[in-house]
Structures are given as structure tokens and as C-alpha cells.
């Protein structure tokens, strides 16, 4: 997907990017690939692939969950890595207030430099484990309208890391490359225990390559019990299932 195809495909979905926004995506690509020579941020570095499998893939979130396009929402991106999905969404919809949490300080430094280069406002960074960031004494607990994760971890694990950060009435949104009904079924207990309820499971695909994508939306209906999330590493080792 060339940058022009990226722009046209989004325009076909009602998302019209300005020349300035296209320039921001170009700078993002250049800085990502340059930094990736010394810091392992992504295995995808070919330009057309980055535009499709990182930038467009991230924007599927806003094309699916449409209030992201117009509302001034607070969004916490857990384990953002090289900034996906939150920073492409921020470029397209600058009114969003973004908080990024990542456990690797080198990635946080890359993202801080990147947002300065792109002149993005209202983006905050935290070098932390998600289990600590959403812990019972954390000021970030139950604070965000939306919490996102674009990760391979199981839904039961992601739910324990992300749901404590969503405010009651907010949502946790998981972006999954593949989704098995069994994985979602196994996560039901965790989602319920943590105060959530699955309200949507959108099946979509990347254009051109037709790779399957799932966007799973979990509503935060009640407060997460204080004992969750458990200490760092425990959710992955022994998920609530």
C-alpha cells in the first residue's frame, strides 16, 4: 500500500487526511525505520508494508469505533511498542488525549522523540509494567475512556492488564490479528470478574492482502476488585480462566 493508496483507501471510508497529516505519517515512517536499525521496534520496515500493516491497521480502530473520530476521549495504550495503534489514531484525530504505557524505557524514549518530531500535543508517556500502572494505589486506575492493546497475549491476560485502567462506563478494546472463539470463551470469566462485558466483536480485514482482523470491545460496567491486577508477571503465568 503506497502512501497515496493509503490516503485514497481511508478517504473511501470517509476519513480524509490533510497534506500535513500525510507528512506526519511520512516522518513517522522515516524515524521508525531509522531507529529500528539500532533498536528492535518492528520486523516490518518496507514502506508499503508499514503503511498497510502498521498505519492502516491502527486506524481500523477508529474506522470501527467511530466516536474516536469526533469525541475528546482519553485513550490509554498498553504496551504500545512502536506507537501502535495510538499514535496513528492521534495523527488522524488530534483531539484525542493519549497516554502510552510501555515496560521498555528505550521504546518510551523513541516515542517521546517521535511525538516531538510530529508536533503532537496531549500525549503522555509512562515507563511501567501495566500491572503496576493500573494497581490499586495508582492514580491512573479507572481513569480512561478507552484502553487499547494490540497484542498477541490472550484476551484473559489482556483483560487483567487493561480493564483496571478503564473508567466505569469506559471501554477496553483489543485489536487481534486472529481471534478464536475458544480464546474469547476462555476470557469470559476474567472479563466478568474484572468488571467488564463484551459488547462487540467486529470482524474486518486489511485491504489488498485481506488479512483478517478482529476488534473486540469490552464495556467496563463496574469497578475492578482491588486485588486486580495481580503482581507483575502473574497474569501471564496464571490467567483468570
Curated annotation (Swiss-Prot):
Compartments (UniProt record): Cytoplasm
Q: Where does S-adenosyl-L-methionine bind?
A: 79, 84, 130-131, 150
Please state the protein's primary subcellular location: cytoplasm
E.C. code: 2.1.1.-
What Gene Ontology terms describe where this protein resides (cellular component)? cytosol
Instruction: Return the InterPro entries for the record.
Output: rRNA_ssu_MeTfrase_G (IPR003682), SAM-dependent_MTases_sf (IPR029063)
Q: Which GO terms describe its molecular function?
A: rRNA (guanine-N7-)-methyltransferase activity
Q: Which family does it belong to?
A: Belongs to the methyltransferase superfamily. RNA methyltransferase RsmG family.
Indicate what this protein is called per its UniProt record.
Ribosomal RNA small subunit methyltransferase G
Q: Which organism is this entry from?
A: Ligilactobacillus salivarius (strain UCC118) (Lactobacillus salivarius)
